[in-house]
Amino acid sequence: MIRIAINGFGRIGRLVLRLALQRKDIEVVAVNDPFISNDYAAYMVKYDSTHGRYKGTVSHDDKHIIIDGVKIATYQERDPANLPWGSLKIDVAVDSTGVFKELDTAQKHIDAGAKKVVITAPSSSAPMFVVGVNHTKYTPDKKIVSNASCTTNCLAPLAKVINDAFGIEEGLMTTVHSMTATQKTVDGPSHKDWRGGRTASGNIIPSSTGAAKAVGKVLPELQGKLTGMAFRVPTVDVSVVDLTVKLEKEATYDQIKKAVKAAAEGPMKGVLGYTEDAVVSSDFLGDTHASIFDASAGIQLSPKFVKLISWYDNEYGYSARVVDLIEYVAKA
């Protein structure tokens, strides 16, 4: 059994918990969040406005949340270095705080006794891995790794398939992205990003994203060939990537569809999905794929210039990849 601890019990932390509980080879041992009491932690596991009520039983005592009869130790420690990961024999600490996302800060989990750390955010210093794209390049000497971002997890599998089959000369990505916790319910101060301070539920908000450039970190052959931006839109979950690329080799749209479908049914099964149905965003709520190619939504201008569309549940699909990466690094 892989013994894990979750630091940070927000959207991703709670969904990683839900998904990890479904895996037979993972045991969730502990949860740490300095801002959440046990009764409130249990409440937030039980009720979720986006993904629905937890179908099992949830309760708590003074030192645990209890899910389906399994006791999970709880802590309210601000400094991860003070957590008892050593005595709890933690194999992998999952850091989903968004705070301890660099090698020097995530090291606190190692200092506390965890064997390895998976960061659920992009990192400028920790090596980034996208399951299905470059995870097999992981080596056990890397104690701290990043699972990159939800958008990179959607874009990278598609970009890899297209680049391997036809070559990408250059490309631009736009993600039409659901609201997240960093946004405002009404107009408020946001000194670094003025647009980001505007009300999330009533606006389409242009925003920056490093997701496309990050693909170059997980696929070095695409370094410098992709960049992108985001539009934040008033939906609670599920986002969509629009990848517009100039190909190196000529291709028909049918050839592109066949290449993506072959990957989705073969080496990227479970990570990359494929659909030809007339779908909309809510159809992917709770989908565990990192990226679902929408074959009927893409368009082609010329044999080397295409726009490709891929959906992703930016919460659930991403959290599923976090759990996959936990399994991979723990067993490596």
From Swiss-Prot:
It comes from Saccharomyces cerevisiae (strain ATCC 204508 / S288c) (Baker's yeast). NCBIfam families: GAPDH-I. GO terms for cellular component: cytosol; fungal-type cell wall; lipid droplet; mitochondrion; plasma membrane. PANTHER family: GLYCERALDEHYDE 3-PHOSPHATE DEHYDROGENASE, GLYCERALDEHYDE-3-PHOSPHATE DEHYDROGENASE-RELATED. Glyceraldehyde-3-phosphate dehydrogenase (GAPDH) involved in glycolysis and gluconeogenesis. Catalyzes the reaction of glyceraldehyde-3-phosphate to 1,3 bis-phosphoglycerate. The contribution of the TDH1, TDH2, and TDH3 to the total glyceraldehyde-3-phosphate dehydrogenase activity is 10-15, 25-30, and 50-60%, respectively. May be involved in a process other than glycolysis because it is synthesized by cells in stationary phase. This is Glyceraldehyde-3-phosphate dehydrogenase 1. GO terms for biological process: gluconeogenesis; glycolytic process. It catalyses: D-glyceraldehyde 3-phosphate + phosphate + NAD(+) = (2R)-3-phospho-glyceroyl phosphate + NADH + H(+); NADH + H2O = (6R)-NADHX; NADH + H2O = (6S)-NADHX; NADPH + H2O = (6R)-NADPHX. Keywords: Cytoplasm, Glycolysis, NAD, Oxidoreductase. NAD(+) binds at R11, I12, D33, T120, N314, Y318. Homotetramer. Pathway: Carbohydrate degradation; glycolysis; pyruvate from D-glyceraldehyde 3-phosphate: step 1/5. The lineage of its organism: Eukaryota, Fungi, Dikarya, Ascomycota, Saccharomycotina. Disruption phenotype: Does not affect growth when ethanol is used as carbon source but impairs growth when glucose is used as carbon source.
